[in-house]
Amino acid sequence: MQKDFIFTSESVSEGHPDKMADQVSDAVLDAILTQDKHARVACETLLTTGLCVIAGEITTTAVIDYNQIARQTIKRIGYDSSDIGFDYNTCSVLVTVGKQSPDIAQGVDRAHDDYLDQGAGDQGLMFGYACNETPVLMPMPIHLAHRLTERQSELRKDGRLPWLRPDAKSQVSIRYVDGKPHSIDTVVLSTQHDPEVSHAQLSEAVIEEIIKPVLPKDMLSADTRYLVNPTGRFVVGGPMGDAGLTGRKIIVDTYGGASPHGGGAFSGKDPSKVDRSAAYAGRYVAKNIVAAGLADKCMVQVSYAIGVAKPTSLMVDTFGTGKIPEAKIVELIQAHFDLRPKGIVNMLDLLRPIYTRTASYGHFGRDEPEFTWEVTDKAAELKAAAGL
């Protein structure tokens, strides 16, 4: 495996059109779970100039106002005028929602291999990942990229940089030496802005107020490159600049490309969908393995069949950093984690309206209390069971 290289990850702000769509879908999910925690929700959102479309399959006893949920979510993000790309107050909101297929429901509600447990909502494969590059056990490039877009939003909302607009993207390239982060090679930050601000003024403020306060000083050097709005202008943004769709930022949502991805998006899906819940469980497992000192880096793959409760496979890769054999780690996972869909829901307390917060700045590497899959409460027992 190559030891010296440059690795890059990107993030996008809450005002990016795809992330707007994710947040609307998860706001719908949260509103439903508040009233009906056993609802089946698969909610997709499309955003384009002046239009928000909400579609999907939803089976619930909850009664919610889709129109107001969409508008209030877009307002919170900051789109309150067509001049900046979208207006929550004047946009059209179209809702076309059906119910979950009864063929799917019969497999989810009663699993074929264990009548006491809920079956998986679909087939699929999911990955979890953790490494010791950062205190939150996330790869450094994606961790820093998220902090940059968070900082852009913070300075926009508190008025310190009043000419910032909601749409933004970041990209961080880290130089690795002997397989470990050594220095920051390149930082890209593109942010939407008012037309009056000059590129020179914007570039200086972004570097000094957004980028440098976030990045570790010991990772910066005279050779670090800062590329701010490289095209020179970013006035038209949001859904006016690009259409937004739920589920189009799955690498931003996870590990920034440092780990494989099973392909299933998260937002708008209730926890019976293993695309979401099993990916969260995979992160929980991998993070506890690294926190326990069983490996410096750990990837977990799990797979499911629709209507079947037990995973169809479980695989671990520690990339040569494991302190015990990977086969032993698999045994420990099977002994200490219940990876059946209902087991995951119970283990991580997922039947709560916690998902809107996950829909921007990453589903992993967060320390808010809603993110139960980030807790390392299994680390001590894993370490003891491994005999370390």
Curated annotation (Swiss-Prot):
Region: Flexible loop, residue numbers: 100-110
Enzyme class per UniProt: transferase
Pathway note: Amino-acid biosynthesis; S-adenosyl-L-methionine biosynthesis; S-adenosyl-L-methionine from L-methionine: step 1/1
Listed InterPro entries: ADOMET_SYNTHASE_CS, S-AdoMet_synt_C, S-AdoMet_synt_central, S-AdoMet_synt_N, S-AdoMet_synthetase, S-AdoMet_synthetase_sfam
Keywords, in A-Z order: ATP-binding, Cytoplasm, Magnesium, Metal-binding, Nucleotide-binding, One-carbon metabolism, Potassium, Transferase
Enzyme Commission (EC) number: 2.5.1.6
Catalytic activity line of the entry: L-methionine + ATP + H2O = S-adenosyl-L-methionine + phosphate + diphosphate
Residues annotated for Mg(2+) binding in this entry: D18
One GO term (biological process): one-carbon metabolic process
Gene Ontology molecular function terms on file: ATP binding; magnesium ion binding; methionine adenosyltransferase activity
PROSITE patterns in alphabetical order: ADOMET_SYNTHASE_1 (PS00376), ADOMET_SYNTHASE_2 (PS00377)
Cofactor annotation comment: Binds 2 divalent ions per subunit. Binds 1 potassium ion per subunit.
Positions of ATP binding: H16, D167, A168, K169, R233, F234, D242, R248, K249, A265, K269
Binding site for K(+): E44
Entry's localization field: Cytoplasm
Residues that bind L-methionine: E57, Q100, D242, K273
Domain of life: Bacteria
Gene Ontology cellular component terms for the protein in this record: cytoplasm
Cited CDD domains: S-AdoMet_synt
Cofactor(s) annotated in UniProt: Mg(2+); K(+)
Family stated for the protein in its record: Belongs to the AdoMet synthase family.
Subunit structure: Homotetramer; dimer of dimers.
Function: Catalyzes the formation of S-adenosylmethionine (AdoMet) from methionine and ATP. The overall synthetic reaction is composed of two sequential steps, AdoMet formation and the subsequent tripolyphosphate hydrolysis which occurs prior to release of AdoMet from the enzyme.
Protein name: S-adenosylmethionine synthase
